[in-house]
Amino acid sequence: MSPHFGLKSTVALRICRDLHPALRVGLLLGAASAAASVLAAPPTVCTAPIAPAATAGAHVVGNGTPASCTESALRAAVSAGSVVTFDCGAAPATIALTSTLVLPATRPTVIDGGGRITFDGGGRVRLIELVHPDFRTNRAGLSLQHITLANGKAVGTRYVPPTPGNASCSFGWADGAGGAIYVRDAMLHVVDVSFRNNAAETPGPDVGGGAIYAAASLDVTIVGSTFDGNSGANGGAVGLLQTDGRFANDLFSNNKATGTGANYVGGAAAGCGGVAQANQGGSGGNGGAVVIDGGADGAQNVCGSTFTSNTSNEFGGALFRTADGAAQATSFDRSLFQNNAARTGGALYVQNSKPLVITASTFSANRATGAGAGDFVGDTLQVTNTTFAGNVATKGLGGALFLVNSGAAGWINNTTFTGNQSSGGPGSFGAAVFGTLDFPITNTVFANNLSADGGSPMQCSFSPGSGANDVQWPQKRPVGGLNDNVCVTGIRFADPQLGALAANGGPTPTATPAWNSPLRKAGHNCAATDQRGVARNAAQCTIGAVE
């Protein structure tokens, strides 16, 4: 039975010291003080889908001194007009909020901190709220930019305890989502904003969004923003329910989904009263940084973003996405997923996305008991120019990917699987991919993906896929000397001579082949550019993610 979040759901790497720029930013996050208003922005990789809102004619908070920038002055400015800026002096200033700033959902509001303002909830109150009563109709809302939101706390009002004698029933908080911002049926545009140490309630099957929670909204777009140290039962940083989401050039680090049990409806939970609906089980724990649920929403897009060191207790260490029966599209482009962890799906859990498009991205050093990098269920998977390196399934199957019911319209092209592991002893195998592949695999390399059960299929555990111009290494299993399962019918066995994961140009780290690698000039019909954005040799391209 599949995990869910929301109203209607069912169901040993060497890492180069030359770190990706976004990771270097991430290392600085923990040292920033609460008074520092805006952390270093992530690198700009993708064209932003929105620009900062204009601030002409603003109502100004303050008269040039920190003492003039008070909570009452802020509330007066918000009440007086739709555009708010600040004049608190040259130094960073913090405005402590003692109650939630409630904004009108039908009037466009702009709040611009100028890079020096922090709203701080002291771990006691949600910071901002805007609620419209309808479902996906309202296009007005909030543009928030150049500011920090810290220590916000969503406080629940209804807790459902565990059911005596039925551990499968759901329990936890029925409300208490959105520690910094709560939005319903309203637009939210976020540009260059830092979210730190905000929290939603936990546990609970449907509460979430330690920093941001948005329900039934047509447009949530987050650009050039950082999320560090946020937590909630689901979606440690962001929770979207029936909401269209766009993420560009964002950094998510050290966020946690702290719920304690996978969510499901029916089956083992039959007879439960449920926290949010009848026959519901579980208490959350999905989506360490981001959780997205819905069938009414549109496509979800992530571009140029970095997810590092996020954790979840259940599914999707970085991001959890279920599209319910509507099979909405999900895309990841030029993004990095590194050192995330979960019980299942160390980086991603994605269900019923058609298509699920992954382009020019890197998944490295993610860990889970099963599906070290990604657990993909019922998706039409389309992967191009992507690297899976050093991901680990610690007690199960699929060191990099675990696939269930993948659609025939999918493909894997010009992709590198290297150094992934399925550890945990006997019964652990499929270090690169576990599951059925019903689509072609072309110009792809499977190199040194190792399983603890050395006598079982090491790299791929499924009936061989179709395809062409693929390379696999090694050929022999370490125990028994048998030939390993082929990942693709007719695959060539050769040592690809790949280097360690490193910054080789482009927005994401890659593993480049040596000058005399058999991957060079061995591919055909490759993507026009490689993972770094470098043009490929059209006649004789290189197998794998890097030309």
Regions found by a protein language model. Give the residues of each.
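Right-handed parallel beta-helix/beta-solenoid
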Residues: 39-72, 500-503
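Surface beta-loop-beta hairpin patches that serve as ligand-binding interfaces in beta-rich domains
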Residues: 41-50, 508-547
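Acidic Gly/Asp/Thr-rich repetitive segments characteristic of extracellular carbohydrate-active
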Residues: 61-85, 525
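Extracellular beta-strand-rich solenoid/capping regions of secreted or surface-exposed proteins
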Residues: 75, 79-80, 96-110, 118-145, ...
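Feature marks extracellular polysaccharide-active and adherence modules
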Residues: 87, 112-114, 120, 130-131, ...
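Glycine-rich beta-solenoid repeat tracts in large extracellular/virion proteins
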Residues: 101-104, 126-136, 157, 179-185, ...
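Acidic/polar low-complexity surface segments
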Residues: 152-174, 197-208, 253-286, 311, ...
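Predominantly extracellular beta-rich ligand-binding scaffolds that present long acidic/polar faces
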Residues: 220-221, 301-305, 323, 350-369, ...
